[in-house]
Amino acid sequence: MTSNRKNENEIINAVSNHSAQMDLLPDARIEDSLCIAEGNNIDPFVSASTVQTGINIAGRILGVLGVPFAGQLASFYSFLVGELWPRGRDQWEIFLEHVEQLINQQITENARNTALARLQGLGDSFRAYQQSLEDWLENRDDARTRSVLHTQYIALELDFLNAMPLFAIRNQEVPLLMVYAQAANLHLLLLRDASLFGSEFGLTSQEIQRYYERQVERTRDYSDYCVEWYNTGLNSLRGTNAASWVRYNQFRRDLTLGVLDLVALFPSYDTRTYPINTSAQLTREVYTDAIGATGVNMASMNWYNNNAPSFSAIEAAAIRSPHLLDFLEQLTIFSASSRWSNTRHMTYWRGHTIQSRPIGGGLNTSTHGATNTSINPVTLRFASRDVYRTESYAGVLLWGIYLEPIHGVPTVRFNFTNPQNISDRGTANYSQPYESPGLQLKDSETELPPETTERPNYESYSHRLSHIGIILQSRVNVPVYSWTHRSADRTNTIGPNRITQIPMVKASELPQGTTVVRGPGFTGGDILRRTNTGGFGPIRVTVNGPLTQRYRIGFRYASTVDFDFFVSRGGTTVNNFRFLRTMNSGDELKYGNFVRRAFTTPFTFTQIQDIIRTSIQGLSGNGEVYIDKIEIIPVTATFEAEYDLERAQEAVNALFTNTNPRRLKTDVTDYHIDQVSNLVACLSDEFCLDEKRELLEKVKYAKRLSDERNLLQDPNFTSINKQPDFISTNEQSNFTSIHEQSEHGWWGSENITIQEGNDVFKENYVTLPGTFNECYPTYLYQKIGESELKAYTRYQLRGYIEDSQDLEIYLIRYNAKHETLDVPGTESLWPLSVESPIGRCGEPNRCAPHFEWNPDLDCSCRDGEKCAHHSHHFSLDIDVGCTDLHENLGVWVVFKIKTQEGHARLGNLEFIEEKPLLGEALSRVKRAEKKWRDKREKLQLETKRVYTEAKEAVDALFVDSQYDRLQADTNIGMIHAADKLVHRIREAYLSELPVIPGVNAEIFEELEGHIITAISLYDARNVVKNGDFNNGLTCWNVKGHVDVQQSHHRSDLVIPEWEAEVSQAVRVCPGCGYILRVTAYKEGYGEGCVTIHEIENNTDELKFKNREEEEVYPTDTGTCNDYTAHQGTAGCADACNSRNAGYEDAYEVDTTASVNYKPTYEEETYTDVRRDNHCEYDRGYVNYPPVPAGYVTKELEYFPETDTVWIEIGETEGKFIVDSVELLLMEE
């Protein structure tokens, strides 16, 4: 095995002739001290044999993962038998001895003998099975060989079941660990044969399933056992000094090679998950022994006894923290020199810098040890080359027998090869002067031998050099080499006929928020972790095959939270789905916490050098997501057809109950039925035409059942606001008509659009845009009539939302149940790689590859709160108590958006009977119903009183009951006061959506109509245009500097200077009487004057002084808040024709009013009261602010003699503030 390499502890005699100048006695003693001490060292043969066998077996397994060819399998089993039961010394005993030496613990004699005897029996049985398998593979039709194989298989598998506990004896677990791992590997490979050949050599389908389930179970158990006892043994060796670190590192390396590497391959034996050839990769690092003199008689001559650093210091210096897999590109070595005499000197490795690069990533440079030396550094370049072997010489510079020696490395040969170009190979050397009694050769192949000696080592090497640390002390300069397995290739090459596993640490860069964490032991390397949304880093791949080949993505993960996993290729998202957590927060990373999942939607690569990106979104809370690897899985036409048919059959069958295949499940939504129909429609006519027809009939029947149970009218949105012919629309029955109309389809605001089915919806859906004013929301509603409802029953509203923001959903009966939903969506379900997601006739091509949403999660947001839903489904329940056809309370279904950013696209709406109410739910709805009726009785008494007061106030405004003439003394304040009383009538409209009339709508609109008439008549009497300055200075003539300012939400004219003047010419009727009324406020000294006059004479004026006591105008004066917004940009002719232009529009039955109602709901809980709706009051004068304190109102009577008068406003000094100017025609 090692005949072509020098022994690890070979001593190179490097003594020069000048050594004779020194005293012979000291020299003799020194040279004697350099003799190898055999007592306390690992047996070289045992160590090399153990490592060689572990590397050989792992290397061969990597070549037969998935479903190997029959010839491969026969050859592989022959190889295993030869490796584990060779002629000569027992390999299993070598395993035991090696671990015993590493941990310095002897296994008991009884346990040893029992284990070895059982292993010998297993070897004999396995060899017989292997020979029978070969015989059968050569002639599978031979009944005799098939029968023999069947019998031997069952017996051998049972032998392994009985034997495994003998390799896990209590308190002997660690020394037996390598034996256990190799035996477990054989057992799992044997179990795999049941899936590979079981049906052919006589196993029943039930037996095959049982063996498969045992394989899955034992894979988990064996993996966790090996990792647990590996960690136990390793931790037991953790010490405080350098000597303990040497053993610790040897255990870590050798049991990684002999135990953990096998464990990492166990999952790939699953032929159902990996039905074709599979490429796995090991990215873990192992560390060869430090390059320092060891095994020397004199203790100080061993580097780890020569005042070496502590255990923790060595570990920190030699072992990198978890990182992305990278490749060594350049090494620069810095040297130092020490001299005792001309014959005793050494120049040695003191420090270095390393340049390395992850696959497709940037160059990283790190510095180790001391680099501030005066000796010229040596630079070695290894770009695209693997250093597969190092031959390092550990030197000891002796300073006499009474002084501590210096340990250093004066010479290293780095043997390299280019894996892409085998002729590019050679040696890079670091060589420095050395004169001292001896050197020790440290050959890396002694610790990491090639996989075979049948080929040159530059072809069969097992590991490549990846990194170098250095242990540094004043007299210790010891490099430590780090190695990665050769299976981790440089290019992430993807083959068209194999499943390619790519560990996530092969990403080209590490995004912010992603960390590399130490692997749990069974993953074959480190893994990536995220605790928030974001990417895991791009993986650059090389496609070795036609770009037309389609692939799927699989991945292995563990998570403490639910999350959405996205996969993109070259910037285009090709897969996404929501995955559930696999573990609880704080749990240890065990094998069972990792699960393997695969997307079903295939994709193609667009270029030979491409990039795969993965990311997570929508974490269900604070937690951790770990990703081990992704898998690139080739897709074949037969696989797709069979998979699609199986998935469609399962989906169709899942629509119906288990007890009655003609009865639809309650939780099957209308949207889900549409998606199942798409699944069936996309089945291949070529492979499964008959099955497709049968499934289509079933899914059509399911759709009919869904339509029959849906209580909504027109759920497919054929129209909105369609007037039924039989509905009355005359004024006397207007509110009854609204209720009747709402029970016959959808009603909504004009900005809602109905759109035909797309890649999300199979049928019509609606789009609700945002609004610029929350008092004029976008809305959609329908009423479920009382006749459709059953007493004491729970009903459910549900549907599908493609995307939404600020979408409010209400169910209203006794009170409102309410949700506000933000559902993130995408622009399209189709990846950019799909050039034409449109069918031949323009319809969406729902069979094209598309993003995979998860529509099957229920909406979980309750309590009226606004939240983001990662489910596109929503549902909302409401309970119905006693039904009354005369009262026809029904259930109102309302969708509303009241923000500018809001929007929604939704469809497949359903209102279905969920279940009868029983127990506590029944009691709750009865209590809610009683509260509602008690509240209604109180409301009726209150309404009667308020209506009487309001009607008296309204009637007092007019001359008689014809409501066509105002009383002579009616002013705007009186109108506002009456309007306030009218608005005290509650439940005129539903507070959730004021377009829907409430129980008091008729009486409210009756009185409100009279208020509107009063305002109109009052406007007609005032001939001053823009007298309240709500339109600024429009219609006024201005001289000097004046301004209109907002004060207390009112518009005031401010005249700050005595030379300024504001005037307006007003048309009047000669001979008629007018009242000039001014409300104003004077600041400072002087007077404010408002003058009215004709051309030559007939002048009168009102004067205002600071702090004068006058009759204050009623504080209810004001105007419509909406007046400025509606008329502010109008010209003089339009804006000033009427003081309250636009008032009637503001007071009509506004079908777009909004709501400020957000009750809190638990499941089955109802509120006792409804809040007032602030938008309802914004529609009129009721919120117009009163005149602030300090303003006074003065008036005078004026009788013009011509048809034009002038009103002029000015002051003598100080500041004059005018709130309003009115010129009112006197009533006769």
Swiss-Prot record:
Q: Which cysteines are joined by disulfide bonds?
A: none
Task of the protein: Promotes colloidosmotic lysis by binding to the midgut epithelial cells of insects.
Q: Write out the entry's keywords from A to Z.
A: Sporulation, Toxin, Virulence
- Any further remark recorded for this protein: Toxic segment of the protein is located in the N-terminus.
Any one Gene Ontology MF annotation carried by this entry is: toxin activity
Write out the biased-composition intervals (Polar residues). Answer: 423-434
- What's a Pfam family this protein contains? Cry1Ac_D5
Similarity-based family: Belongs to the delta endotoxin family.
Q: Which organism is it from?
A: Bacillus thuringiensis subsp. entomocidus
Residues annotated as region Disordered? 423-458
Q: Which protein is depicted? A: Pesticidal crystal protein Cry1Ba
Q: Which GO terms describe its biological process?
A: sporulation resulting in formation of a cellular spore; symbiont-mediated killing of host cell
The record's annotation in InterPro entries points to: Cry1Ac-like_dom-VII, Cry_V, Galactose-bd-like_sf, Pest_crys, Pest_crys_Cry1Aa_dom-IV, Pest_crys_dom-III, Pest_crys_dom_I, Pest_crys_N_sf
